[in-house]
């Protein structure tokens, strides 16, 4: 009898929760239509996987890619609409958030065709891989629009947990297991530090969790200049610094890049930085509005450390993926300049434009590493020597992406860095910009060193990996070559059309 009553109570409570969720989705669903499309794609993937066999594998790629493209389309149709707050203040929709959501969707859309050949050759489980990619994308999109501390944390952990699972996806690989363990432990520690910072904000603001209400609460309690705010700022900066791979919180990055499957590294190298940058801009700009001088100083120090350490240590690396790991640490230091400049002097517009170029440059480089690794089984920089003699297209396209990452004209990376540094110079960040320019020159050195190896024709320098190199036919109908071509074009042509792209970013933001 007691069990029967408890069962009825459980059913009634479950029904109320379901009806409340349905009511919220019915009246607020249009505000998260791109996210809803991804959720529908996830459900469809699970249903097909449970009722199909291996012959239906192409459908998994098609459904995932279609969901992402439809989500981008829904986002573009919503462009330039008035800012809206939905779900009882938990989620905010505006142009600024939507730009970051677009960048995350673009990363995922390019990463899926980049991953197909690798998955086919290594015989990895396809369904789970795509589920983790889509769920991480979903977490990143919710993180961009999150408007309160709880939603920020849940969305961040959704993205982080999928990242941990993806990094350890090749569970029989010892290096992958080591990378996952380090990533999980350090990621958990950084999340704890971040939440501790959130708890200080919650307490000092009088129990507020919405970002704008935290500011109002700090004014009401007159705690906006208290030592507690400085403590909260330090803890939150450390937590976000880990997510962005800023020095000195970058120790996990090289090991995770080296041990994880290459398509996973390509995905994490761009999406994690886009999502964390979106979080950083909103967290620092809104709750810490009254502490702008303090967080500017903190970010300047971290950016300088990242640019110097990242680029100097990259010179000594022998693994291509580890070199790109340290390179990405230096690259995020450049992005921080845009965050510090902010609304003034087109800081955000130049930062977003550079991140768009960085996505193309980085994914283009990783696409070539995937293809070279599948054909030779090596990741050593020395083993790329003489690749031009065997595969000119692969060597030239890799060289273009590396030159663009280094910032040589007339490629996209040069114009992206030029405008970012110019915005920083106008804002008075002379020392920071000077360090950025010097470290950019250093980065050109190690990129050119790789390009020199690619183009060498001397037999004594060509390794057996390249001597025995064979352009084996692709199993996946040239999907990886599609990503390669798109990324190469995006890494070169936008340099010529920099002004229109920047004008679109400025017009959208302001």
From Swiss-Prot:
It catalyses: a plastoquinone + NADH + (n+1) H(+)(in) = a plastoquinol + NAD(+) + n H(+)(out); a plastoquinone + NADPH + (n+1) H(+)(in) = a plastoquinol + NADP(+) + n H(+)(out). NDH is composed of at least 16 different subunits, 5 of which are encoded in the nucleus. The keyword Hydrolase does not apply. Belongs to the complex I subunit 2 family. It is a multi-pass membrane protein. It comes from Lemna minor. It is found in: Plastid, Chloroplast thylakoid membrane. Its main location: plastid. NDH shuttles electrons from NAD(P)H:plastoquinone, via FMN and iron-sulfur (Fe-S) centers, to quinones in the photosynthetic chain and possibly in a chloroplast respiratory chain. The immediate electron acceptor for the enzyme in this species is believed to be plastoquinone. Couples the redox reaction to proton translocation, and thus conserves the redox energy in a proton gradient. The chain crosses the membrane at residues 24-44, 59-79, 99-119, 124-144, 149-169, 184-204, 229-249, 262-284, 295-315, 323-343, 354-374, 395-415, 418-438. This is NAD(P)H-quinone oxidoreductase subunit 2 A, chloroplastic. GO terms for cellular component: chloroplast thylakoid membrane. It holds the Pfam family Ndh2_N. InterPro entries: NADH-Q_OxRdtase_suN/2, ND/Mrp_TM, Ndh2_N. One of its GO terms (molecular function) is quinone binding. GO terms for biological process: ATP synthesis coupled electron transport; photosynthesis, light reaction. The gene is ndhB1. It is an enzyme of class 7 (translocase). Its EC number is 7.1.1.-. Keywords: Chloroplast, Membrane, NAD, NADP, Plastid, Plastoquinone, Quinone, Thylakoid, Translocase, Transmembrane, Transmembrane helix, Transport.
């Amino acid at each position: 009898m007691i069990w029967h009553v408890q069962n009825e109570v459980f059913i009634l409570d479950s029904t109320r929760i379901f009806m409340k969720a349905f009511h919220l989705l019915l009246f607020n669903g249009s505000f998260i239509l791109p996210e809803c499309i991804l959720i529908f794609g996830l459900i469809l993937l699970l249903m097909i996987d449970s009722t199909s066999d291996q012959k239906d594998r192409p459908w998994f790629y098609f459904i995932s890619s279609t969901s992402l493209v439809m989500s981008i389309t829904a986002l573009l149709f919503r462009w330039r609409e008035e800012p809206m707050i939905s779900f009882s203040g938990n989620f905010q929709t505006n142009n600024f958030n939507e730009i970051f959501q677009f960048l995350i969707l673009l990363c995922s859309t390019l990463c899926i065709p980049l991953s197909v050949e690798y998955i086919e050759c290594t015989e990895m489980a396809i369904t789970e891989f795509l589920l983790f990619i889509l769920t991480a994308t979903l977490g990143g999109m919710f993180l961009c629009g999150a408007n309160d501390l709880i939603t920020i944390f849940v969305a961040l952990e959704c993205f982080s947990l999928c990242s941990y699972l993806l990094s350890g996806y090749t569970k029989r690989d010892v290096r992958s297991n080591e990378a996952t363990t380090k990533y999980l432990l350090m990621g958990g520690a950084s999340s704890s530090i971040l939440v501790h910072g959130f708890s200080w904000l919650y307490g000092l603001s009088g129990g507020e969790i919405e970002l704008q209400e935290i500011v109002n609460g700090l004014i009401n309690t007159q705690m906006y200049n208290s030592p507690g705010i400085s403590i909260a700022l330090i803890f939150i900066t450390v937590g976000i610094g880990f997510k962005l791979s800023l020095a000195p919180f970058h120790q996990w990055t090289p090991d995770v890049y080296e041990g994880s499957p290459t398509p996973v590294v390509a995905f994490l190298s761009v999406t994690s930085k886009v999502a964390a940058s979106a979080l950083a801009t909103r967290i620092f700009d809104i709750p810490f509005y009254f502490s702008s001088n303090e967080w500017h100083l903190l970010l300047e120090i971290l950016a300088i450390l990242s640019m110097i350490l990242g680029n100097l240590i990259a010179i000594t690396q022998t693994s291509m993926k580890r070199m790109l790991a340290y390179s990405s640490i230096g690259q995020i230091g450049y992005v921080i300049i845009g965050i510090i400049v902010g609304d003034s002097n087109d800081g955000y517009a130049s930062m977003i434009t550079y991140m768009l170029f960085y996505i193309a440059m980085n994914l283009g480089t990783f696409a070539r590493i995937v293809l070279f690794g599948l054909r030779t089984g090596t990741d050593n920089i020395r083993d790329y020597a003489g690749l031009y003699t065997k595969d000119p297209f692969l060597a030239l396209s890799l060289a273009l992406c590396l030159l663009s990452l280094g910032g040589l004209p007339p490629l996209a990376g040069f114009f992206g860095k030029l405008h970012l540094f110019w915005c920083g110079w106008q804002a008075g960040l002379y020392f920071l910009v000077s360090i950025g320019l010097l470290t950019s020159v250093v980065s050109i050195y190690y990129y050119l060193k790789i390009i020199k190896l690619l183009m060498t024709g001397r037999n004594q320098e060509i390794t057996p990996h390249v001597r025995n190199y064979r352009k084996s036919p692709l199993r996946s109908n040239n999907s990886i070559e599609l990503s390669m071509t798109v990324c190469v074009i995006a890494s070169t042509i936008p340099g010529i059309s920099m002004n229109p792209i920047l004008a679109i970013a400025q017009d959208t933001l302001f």
